Amino acid sequence: SLQSIKETLLVDSSPKALYITSPDYYGMVADIESIAKICHQSNTILLVDNAHGTLLNFLDVNIHPIHLGADMCSDSAHKMLPVLTGGGYLHINNSDYVSMGKTAMSFFGSTSPSYLIMESLDLCNKYIQESLKSDLIRVIENIQKLKYRFKDKFCFANSKEPLHLTFLTWKTHQSGLDLANQLRRFNIEC
């Protein structure tokens, strides 16, 4: 909770960074803006694992962690964009942390980077500039139609993030396998 983060960071001077995941696997988004304010009041770096939120920057309302005040944010591009597995972006929002980011990457990076992954990121950057916005509008519309079509049959988790479709099977008293079989009849694989 925001209160527990505030109590921990403002009372205890030992945390140097706060690492959170947002959105989570189910599309639930943390209040990054409020968390960033608390972190900055206590001189704590806010690092966000945005693995499932790579596209948040391109929504009508930008809720990408960097836009909301995170100091650093990692996007797993391969999860939501046409990028080879392992391709991702590290965004650094504070110039004071650029050298720290480069140093950390030198510890974890390979001396033999994958040029295929790097090329897929470059091609994806081109796609983002040329086609993503129109494709994103279409995908969001399709997700909304799907939610409407199945609103009486399934329960969906509420999320600020419109690109995740999370079925709450426990509310409909069915197993995930039952749901998968039902969706398969509509050519939907999950």
Q: Locations of the language-model features?
A:
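Conserved PLP-enzyme active-site core in the AAT-like
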Residues: 1-156, 169, 174
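Residues at beta-strand starts and edge strands
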Residues: 86, 161-163
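Short beta-strand
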Residues: 155-160, 190
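Conserved PLP-binding active-site segment of the aspartate aminotransferase-like
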Residues: 163-190
